[in-house]
Design a protein with these regions (language model features):
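N-terminal glycine-rich phosphate/pyrophosphate-binding loop and immediately adjacent elements
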Residues: 3-100
């Protein structure tokens, strides 16, 4: 990765909070660089496979804490935000095919 001394702000961590911060700062005209150690950004908002064939966001239950102002300001629906209501809070698949 090339280094640059032209950044106004360096944000360590590309989790959802770091990305929101970066978006607001960039909107003011600042040059922002975000560094993330993982191969993808999003932090707790990332959807990952926790069991073969089963994908979930590890912190999807916190979506209710997402400030509506942030959703509007960043036009998240225009960028693919879709909140899906689940009929159950938890799901546990069992090795014998049953679940609860």
């Amino acid at each position: 990765m090339a280094t640059s001394r032209n950044d106004d702000v360096l944000i360590i961590g590309g989790g959802h909070n770091g990305l929101v911060c970066a978006a607001y700062l960039a909107a003011t005209g600042l040059k922002v660089r975000v560094l993330e150690r993982r191969h993808l950004v999003g932090g707790a908002a990332v959807t990952e496979e926790f069991h073969p064939g089963f994908r979930n966001s590890v912190a999807s239950y916190t979506v209710s804490l997402l400030n509506p102002k942030v959703i509007r300001d960043l036009r998240l629906h225009e960028h693919g935000l879709r909140v899906v209501e689940r009929p159950y809070a938890n799901f546990l698949p069992l090795p014998d095919g049953r679940s609860f």
